[in-house]
Every structure is written in C-alpha cells, then in structure tokens.
UniProtKB/Swiss-Prot annotation:
Organism: Schizosaccharomyces pombe (strain 972 / ATCC 24843)
Originating gene: hhp2
UniProt record similarity statement: Belongs to the protein kinase superfamily. CK1 Ser/Thr protein kinase family. Casein kinase I subfamily.
Domain of life: Eukaryota
Subcellular location: Nucleus
Gene3D superfamilies: Transferase(Phosphotransferase) domain 1 (1.10.510.10)
Residues binding ATP, per UniProt: I18, G19, S20, G21, S22, F23, G24, Q25, I26, K41
Name of the protein described by the UniProt record: Casein kinase I homolog hhp2
Reactions that this protein is recorded to catalyse: L-seryl-[protein] + ATP = O-phospho-L-seryl-[protein] + ADP + H(+); L-threonyl-[protein] + ATP = O-phospho-L-threonyl-[protein] + ADP + H(+)
C-alpha cells in the first residue's frame, strides 16, 4: 500500500507530498466529509527516532494561540504515525524567494513584531523552539497572521509548575539549522530563551541583506562546515553584519547575545525597539507586505498587457476619441481577496504561492506590550488615526 492509498482517521485522504519537517514528511490531505484541505504529517513506525507523538503533545500544550496551527487528529494508521493539522499558506522563505530574495525594511519590521510575539508565547509555555528559521514560519491562508510550525526539536526549558530552569550544560551537539544557530549553540552550550531570539536576529538580517556572510561555505564534512560557519559568525563584527541598516539591529543583536543563560528576555522592549523604528521611518502598521505589492504589480502589468493586445473596440462617433485615460493607481490596502476555491476540488498546496497575500478585510488583533490588553488592527483607510493609537500603546509601560 502506498502513502496515497492511506485513509487517516476514517475521513482524511492523502494527496501529494508538499514538504518535510524536522522529522517526517508532510502531505496535502482532504477531509472527505466536508471537502476541507488539510496538511498531514507522516512518520514511519519503523523510524529510528519517534518524534511525531512528542510534537503532537507540544502542539497540544501550545494550542489556542493565534499563531499556532490547530491539530485535527493524531494516531497510528497502517505503518505510520499520522498528524492532521491546518493547511497553511507559503513560508517566509517561499515569500522571500518570490520577492527576489530581499525584503524592504518595512516588511522586515512588520514581520519582526509578530515573530517576537510568537517566540514569546512559546517561551511562556515553558518551551524553546530551537529551530528558528524562515521555513518554520508560514502565513495563514487569506490572512496576514504569521504561524509558527515544526516543534519536533522543541524542548522544555523549565518545570511547568515551579518554573525551575534546566541546568547549564556544555559539550552539546548542534541542534537546529547552522545558518541561524546562535554562537552559544555553535560552541556546545545548552540552549535557552536567548538562543531562539539570537536566531531570530539572524533571520531578520537575512531578510534585510538577502544573505548572510557564512552562507555557501564549503567543507569536506558536516562537522567541518559547521566549524567554518561558527568561526565566520564569531569573526564577523556586528557593525559589518548590520552595515547599512538602522542601529536598532545592532542593539537587538547585542541585547540577545548579552542575556544570561536563565535570564528572561524583555520581549516588550524588543518589540518596541522595532515599532519605534517603524514609526520613525514613517511606515504605516497596515500589514501590507512586499509580496502583496508585487502580486498587485504583476496583476496590473498583466491587465495592461492584455488590454494592449486586445482588438480595438468600435465606438460611437458621438463619443470623443481623445478622452484621457485614468492611470492605474495601486491601492494596496484594498487588494481583493482571492476567489474562494471549490473545497471539493483538491489543488496543489503551491498552486499560488501568494494565496495568503491579500490583506484581510476583517479586523485583526495584535498583542500589545501591555498584558491583558488587545488592540484591533483596522486598515488605514478605515482608521486614519491608527498610528496615533499605536503610539499610545507604546507609551504604556508593561506590568512587572
């Protein structure tokens, strides 16, 4: 029996492979009862290390947050452990490539705000992610919400009840992705909250720069390659790494690198660092990312090309032939949502890499630095005073 012949939980049919996680393969799935598309992660029972059940348990602990996918089903079917979850949109790595392997500063700042919040939430549940990279952040379909995935390498760093931190250890093997690993991870120190945030710093710099200095290094063995990456990472001054970027990026990297092993990061401070930069640069917190603009421009160009090649229309002699044509003025805050697909017609997960690219017409919530206060995002066209509201939020001090 092949994978595509397997029926999961008596109602999910498996389609083609759409990706891989730290452990297991991911397939497109279809709910045969209501036609809803899902993602199915499979792990062979004969695998040397069984991690999928562990990942399922982590998801169960993290469930309920806006940036965590919902698990629909978990169990054993045929010769596989199987986990059925939300089908999400493209990853930030996919969108980065779609945008020519570089994001504008505005997009990086908008992403940073959500990514810091996702990491903070996972840490608040006593877990480290330990594999922070663009591939593990996906956009929700038809939404502007960044979702965090792949908790196969996640680790509990403190006791759930007492919050006693795990002890400091060294001589640890590198866990995660070497390109974004913290310096302490490279030198074998047990990971803690600071390492997730340092890894995020490298992700943000990757988005701004287009690449990192230690990419593409060659070596005979994996260990030698990791050593070259480590040496380059340690030997690259932050002034060089952040050259041409606002000083906030150096501040962020210095802060995360100077945290002690058990120290709780000030997530609100880091968010405010980038939010203040967003305001100082005059950007709107409007959830309009680079891929939305690029998608709009491509659609406008295609429409203009189609119009130019269309046969001329016969017009009435009473109508002036010299009437001016209004130019296309992009209104990125009102890009229409993609047409709803027929849920009974399975389509490729990557049929349109920017299915999530249109800003939602519905209000979106974002977490303020003030505990127990949620503020709704309203598109700038509906609430011009939003920037003033954001400033008011940032002026409030977080509770101790």
């Amino acid at each position: 029996m092949t994978v595509v012949d397997i029926k999961i939980g008596n109602k999910y049919r498996i389609g083609r492979k759409i990706g891989s996680g730290s452990f297991g393969q991911i397939y497109l799935g279809l709910n045969t009862v209501n036609g809803e598309q899902v993602a199915v992660k499979l792990e062979p029972l004969k695998a040397r290390h069984h991690q999928l059940e562990y990942e399922f348990r982590v998801y169960n602990i993290l469930k309920g947050n806006i940036g965590i996918p919902t698990i629909r089903w978990f169990g054993v079917t045929n010769s596989y452990n199987a986990m059925v979850m939300d089908l999400l949109g493209p990853s930030l790595e996919d969108l980065f490539c779609y945008c020519g392997r570089k994001f504008t500063l505005k997009t990086v700042l908008l992403l940073a705000d959500q990514l810091i919040s996702r990491i903070e939430y996972v840490h608040s549940k006593s877990f480290l992610h330990r594999d922070i990279k663009p591939d593990n952040f996906l956009m929700k379909k038809h939404s502007n919400v960044v979702t965090m995935i792949d908790f196969g390498l996640a680790k509990k760093y403190r006791d759930f009840k007492t919050h006693v931190h795990i002890p400091y250890r060294d001589n640890k093997n590198l866990t995660g992705t070497a390109r974004y690993a913290s310096i302490n991870t490279h030198i074998g120190i047990e990971q803690s909250r600071r390492d997730d945030l340092e890894s995020l710093g490298y992700v943000l710099l990757y988005f701004c720069r287009g690449s990192l200095p230690w990419q593409g290094l060659q070596a005979d063995t994996k260990e030698q390659k990791y050593q070259r990456i480590r040496d380059t990472k340690i030997g690259t001054p932050l002034e060089v790494l952040c050259k041409g970027l606002p000083e906030e990026f150096i501040t962020y990297m210095c802060y995360t690198r100077q945290l002690s092993f058990t120290e709780k990061p000030n997530y609100a401070y880091l968010r405010k660092l980038f939010r203040d930069l967003l305001i100082r640069k005059g950007y709107q917190y409007d959830y309009v990312f680079d891929w939305m603009i690029l998608k709009y421009q491509k659609r406008a160009a295609a429409a203009a090309a189609a119009s130019a090649t269309a046969p001329p229309q016969v017009t009435s002699p009473m109508v002036s032939q010299t009437q001016p044509v209004n130019p296309i003025t992009p209104n990125y805050s009102s890009i229409p949502l993609p047409a709803e697909r027929n849920p009974k017609t399975p389509q490729s997960f990557s049929t349109n890499i920017v299915q999530c690219a249109s800003p939602s017409p519905l209000p979106l919530s974002f977490r303020s630095p003030v505990p127990n206060k949620d503020y709704e995002y309203i598109p700038s066209s509906l609430q011009p005073q939003y920037s003033a509201q954001l400033r008011r939020v940032l002026d409030e001090e977080p509770a101790p």
